[in-house]
């Protein structure tokens, strides 16, 4: 019998609405370019792994993949504290996570989503880089090991740091691709999975400084003081 493909996951109205509202910023002002969209499956469990240099990265990734599927990102829990934002994030299927605390509840929610055939988006560095070399955290590897049937897809985002640099228009580029070393190997440790995925992603998308000129310069000095290699 021929193999039956998984049913395409419906995209929620709220998700479509938010993407439509933000489209002018990303598609028009940001001149969005999408490469390798075919690597993002339209159905089935998918773990999407990317770099994080700007608050706009999740939006750009969602915009780049919106014709294919709904991406549920692990997002910092403090976003749920903004008035009116929590119900929108919930309706979009986003998953709140306590940063830096090994949030078992959030990871379990992500695992359940993957096992249910959804797409989870993660940033192994855990937060915006702000010009610094951040270590990849083990959570990404844990998700990959807990749901080995999930397809592993990498994504790079560039240009989002320039969105606020008016009147200069940014050129946002989102590229989806399959990791060069393939899926999780036998006996591979969670941290090792996260590290190798992030290393390849950063080769394609080096750390970029967010903010306007003064902010970017302040972040540059702080990054160089912390680690001179960060922006070299």
Give residue ranges: language-model regions.
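Short amphipathic alpha-helix with an adjacent loop that forms part of the alpha/beta core around
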Residues: 38-41, 111-112
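Short amphipathic alpha-helical segments and helix-helix/interface helices
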Residues: 22, 61-62, 86, 110, ...
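Short, flexible loop segments at the rims of nucleotide/cofactor-binding pockets, characterized by
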Residues: 23-29, 50, 96-100, 130-132
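Conserved beta-strand scaffold positions in the cores of enzyme catalytic domains, especially
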Residues: 34, 73, 94-96, 152, ...
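Residues at the C-termini of beta-strands that transition into short coil/loop
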Residues: 38, 77, 98, 156, ...
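Non-catalytic C-terminal accessory region of glycerolipid acyltransferases
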Residues: 2-14, 104-232
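Catalytic core of membrane glycerolipid acyltransferases/transacylases, capturing the structured
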Residues: 41-101
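A transmembrane-helix-recognition feature enriched in membrane-embedded lipid enzymes
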Residues: 2-39, 67, 83-92
